[in-house]
């Protein structure tokens, strides 16, 4: 059985976080490890994590995305690290697609990412609801089932997954990029330097 450690940094965004975690639990084929880093958490996130028995790290103040992810990564116990935003919702069977791709590869020097759709006016625009309360999972699942995307090379969208071994080799996210701007392309550059071509 394959299992991922899903790292989610969060900063007082509880309603979205709950929806993201619901999507992991309801739309995954496999049972994954969910690890939060809670920045501040004064909106009830800390109590929610305790009640749900989630694995988490915590900082009283917002330490920035890169530091938050790196702290959460200290709790990883699986072979794969997946980075997810706290306001994302995963398609049904999302993990099966990643598992199938990973099994094709000859080694663990890879970086795989998903396709990110947003309600804003970008190339990948789609609106299944503008808030957690208005989100329509049935509409979203229909979209995921019918939308066909080409595989992209060179994308650095979250969610993305690497092996834990590779994460450790490159040292996770570079904390000089806190609060987080530029951290994704920097992470990809560190992977490139370490011979990652997929």
Identify the residue ranges that each predicted region occupies.
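Short, acidic, metal-binding catalytic loop of nucleotide-sugar glycosyltransferases
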Residues: 22-31
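Short aromatic/hydrophobic "clamp" motif used to bind/position activated sugar donors
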Residues: 81
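A short, conserved alpha-helix in the catalytic core of glycosyltransferases
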Residues: 153-171, 176-198
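A recurrent flexible, glycine/aromatic-enriched loop bordering the glycosyltransferase active site
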Residues: 66, 140-165
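A conserved acidic beta->alpha catalytic loop
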Residues: 30, 38-46
């Amino acid at each position: 059985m394959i299992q991922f450690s899903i790292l989610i940094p969060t900063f007082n965004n509880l309603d979205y976080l709950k929806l993201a975690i619901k999507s992991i639990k309801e739309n995954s084929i496999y049972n994954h490890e969910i690890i939060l880093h809670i920045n501040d958490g004064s909106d009830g996130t800390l109590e929610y994590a305790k009640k749900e028995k989630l694995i988490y790290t915590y900082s009283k103040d917002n330490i920035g995305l890169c530091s938050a992810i790196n702290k959460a990564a200290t709790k990883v116990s699986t072979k794969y690290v997946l980075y997810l935003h706290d306001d994302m919702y995963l398609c049904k069977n999302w993990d099966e697609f990643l598992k199938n791709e990973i099994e094709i590869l000859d080694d663990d020097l890879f970086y795989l990412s998903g396709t990110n759709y947003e309600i804003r006016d970008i190339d990948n625009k789609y609106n299944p609801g503008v808030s957690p309360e208005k989100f329509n999972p049935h509409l979203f699942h229909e979209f995921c089932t019918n939308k066909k995307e080409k595989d992209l090379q060179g994308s650095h969208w979250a969610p993305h997954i690497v092996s834990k071994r590779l994460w450790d080799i490159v040292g996770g996210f570079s904390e000089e990029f806190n609060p987080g701007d530029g951290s994704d392309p920097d992470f990809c550059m560190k992977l490139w330097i370490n011979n990652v071509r997929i």
